[in-house]
């Protein structure tokens, strides 16, 4: 909702994060949420998934450095935790589990982990004031009608008055975050 940005005097800059963003004006804050988000794309386009995450983050960190921003927030993912010990349901920020780097679906998780590392490196070497937020899978307004992730399937079933059908045995639990709750 662009009107919400304008109401607070914020300017939304739209561009392709795979290219450096030509911004002439001063920049105070950067909120970096650009990412490939569809699991199907992680598997069908793992190289592009990784490069979008890394190059996009690099370009925004360079912009933050050049403009000497007051702060930058990188929206990462709880997927950086990988597979953690099932005995510990309470995961801390320092609890990194296993991610198989050779599994193509890991392109998203590994890309996010590496981007967090890049943020830390820019903070250390160039003093870029960057913070990281690890979000659960986020959904909300603006999702494509063709979206096939579970929350979209459930929403479609609810809107049609149909039963919600699980395509698994139902034993897995997942965390979801509504967009406005993340903001």
How would you name each of these model-derived features?
Residues 1-8:
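Glycine-rich phosphate-binding loop and adjoining beta1-alpha1-beta2 segment
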Residues 10, 14-52, 66:
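NAD(P)H-binding glycine-rich loop region in Rossmannoid oxidoreductase-like domains
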Residues 64, 123, 158, 166:
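Hydrophobic pocket-lining residues that define ligand/cofactor binding sites across diverse proteins
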Residues 77:
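Residue(s) in the substrate-gating loop at a strand-loop-helix junction
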Residues 107-110, 118, 131-132, 143-156, ...:
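Substrate-positioning beta->alpha
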């Amino acid at each position: 909702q662009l009107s919400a940005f304008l109401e607070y005097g914020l300017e939304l800059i739209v561009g392709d994060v795979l290219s450096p963003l030509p911004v002439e004006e001063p920049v105070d804050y950067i909120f970096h949420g650009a990412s490939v988000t569809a699991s199907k794309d992680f598997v069908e386009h793992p190289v592009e998934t990784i490069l979008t995450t890394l190059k996009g983050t690099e370009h925004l960190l360079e912009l933050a450095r050049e403009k000497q921003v007051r702060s930058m927030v990188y929206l990462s993912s709880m997927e950086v935790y990988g597979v953690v010990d099932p005995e510990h349901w309470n995961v801390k920020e320092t609890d990194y589990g296993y991610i198989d780097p050779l599994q193509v679906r890991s392109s998203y998780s590994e890309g996010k982990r590496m981007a967090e590392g890049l943020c830390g490196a820019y903070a250390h070497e160039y003093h870029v004031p960057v913070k990281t937020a690890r979000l659960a899978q986020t959904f909300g307004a603006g999702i494509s009608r063709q979206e096939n992730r579970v929350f979209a399937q459930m929403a479609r079933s609810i809107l049609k008055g149909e039963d919600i059908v699980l395509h698994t045995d139902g034993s897995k639990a997942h965390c979801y975050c509504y967009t406005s709750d993340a903001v």
